């Protein structure tokens, strides 16, 4: 069976490399971007199975990219990965169409599990965000 194709965007190049490296063991990372506009263009071009987006990116933020993708019927599941832990922000991401939300501090423990859940259509939010 083919490995799921994933796209990753984060405005921090070092964290972006770390994410791509972490995910490469189980997914094919087809492309990466450091801003929201480039992310949108590359997602439309490569048509990945999953998308991981930072929340705070230049040009378009993760919620704006998610909202834009959600307008398409063929949109892949989007997982927001952010340092932002405010429950209102988590809810805004969900309302924009995000399938899941993972805190960056929990990436090592939760991201792969979250992505597998998103592929199966199951929502996931970092347990520490549920209060």
Language model segments and positions:
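Two-component/phosphorelay signaling modules centered on CheY-like receiver
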Residues: 13-31
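Receiver (REC) domain active-site loop signature in two-component systems and cognate sites
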Residues: 57
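Short amphipathic alpha-helix used as the core "switch/output" element in two-component signaling
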Residues: 41, 63-74
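Acidic catalytic/metal-coordinating carboxylates
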Residues: 35-38, 60-64
């Amino acid at each position: 069976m083919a490995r799921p194709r994933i796209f990753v965007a984060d405005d921090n190049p070092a964290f972006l490399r770390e994410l791509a490296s972490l995910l490469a063991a189980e997914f094919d990372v087809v492309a990466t971007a450091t801003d929201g506009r480039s992310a949108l263009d590359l997602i439309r071009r490569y048509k990945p199975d999953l998308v991981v987006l930072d929340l705070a990116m230049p040009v378009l933020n993760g919620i704006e990219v998610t909202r834009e993708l959600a307008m398409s019927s063929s949109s892949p599941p989007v997982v927001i990965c952010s340092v932002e832990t405010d429950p209102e922000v988590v809810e805004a991401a969900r309302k924009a169409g995000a399938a899941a939300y993972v805190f960056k501090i929990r990436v090592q423990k939760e991201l792969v599990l979250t992505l597998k859940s998103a592929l199966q259509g199951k929502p996931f939010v970092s347990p520490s965000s549920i209060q």
